[in-house]
């Protein structure tokens, strides 16, 4: 079989893989038992190297494919996998709703928490751009802050007060923790494709260093680290944390 190359961000700020969407695809690769290698791309090169201008993407032989959901669906179909089998219609509806909550709402709160705060952004710049002198890092950091702030304003999170963002985060985290307290995985006794989205995002929030207001909030939910432990075990001791 052709070796799959998964392209992602480097390790940074306590996380083995900075992008939760790359973590999500890596979990699918492990679940499906596929052979793969991870190629870490400098954030400054992602736009020019990636077919879609962002991570993740994969290469198999001469073909490339982008978008985490498209990659997972392709790998599952190619492998005759069971990632989408055995789910009831109600489970699919709930799984999709929680995936959207995580990837299209909580994600933006996480981006704001990591990139807008001075401490957090400085740690990211140092971690990701350590090969550049400090003045260049500071310029890139300031430009990145402006770009991310603009994206978050378009999305809506960036137009809220800190207090409003906090309330939104509480709602998202409580919804996830309420669901995860009912059963070992998101939808039942075993892992499903929706766990990859939720576990990837929660790990990216919880294990990020330095801590920020969102990671502090997430730590109030004891079920999150327990759940991530179960996901890791199920995928053969998957490591979320940077060595």
Place the predicted regions along the sequence by residue:
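GST-like domain detector, emphasizing the conserved glutathione-binding G-site
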Residues: 1-138
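Amphipathic alpha-helical segments that form well-ordered structural scaffolds
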Residues: 24, 28-31, 168-179, 230
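Acidic carboxylate-rich catalytic motifs and surrounding loops in phosphoryl-/glycosyl-chemistry enzymes
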Residues: 39-45, 189-191, 242-243
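GST-like fold's C-terminal all-alpha helical module
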Residues: 108-217, 223
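C-terminal helix/juxtamembrane-tail motif
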Residues: 230-243
């Amino acid at each position: 079989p052709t070796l799959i190359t998964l392209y992602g961000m480097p390790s940074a700020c306590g996380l083995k893989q900075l992008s939760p969407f790359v973590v999500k695809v890596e979990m699918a690769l492990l679940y499906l038992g596929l052979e793969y290698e991870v190629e870490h791309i400098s954030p400054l090169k992602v736009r020019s190297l990636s077919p879609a201008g962002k991570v993740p993407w994969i290469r198999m032989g001469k073909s490339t494919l982008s978008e985490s959901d498209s990659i997972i669906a392709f790998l599952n179909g190619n492998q005759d996998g069971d990632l989408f089998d055995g789910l009831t219609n109600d489970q699919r509806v709930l799984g999709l709703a929680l995936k959207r909550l995580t990837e299209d709402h909580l994600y933006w709160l996480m981006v704001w928490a990591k990139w807008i705060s001075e401490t957090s952004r400085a740690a990211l710049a140092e971690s990701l751009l350590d090969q550049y002198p400090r003045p260049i890092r500071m310029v890139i950091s300031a430009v990145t802050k402006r770009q991310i702030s603009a994206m978050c304003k378009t999305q809506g999170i960036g137009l809220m007060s800190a207090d409003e963002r906090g309330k939104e985060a509480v709602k998202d985290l409580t919804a996830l923790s309420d669901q995860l307290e009912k059963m070992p995985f998101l939808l039942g006794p075993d892992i499903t494709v929706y766990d990859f989205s939720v576990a990837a995002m929660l790990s990216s929030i919880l294990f990020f260093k330095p801590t920020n207001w969102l990671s502090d909030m997430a730590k109030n939910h004891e079920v999150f680290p327990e759940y991530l432990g179960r996901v890791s075990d199920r995928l053969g001791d998957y490591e979320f944390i940077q060595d």
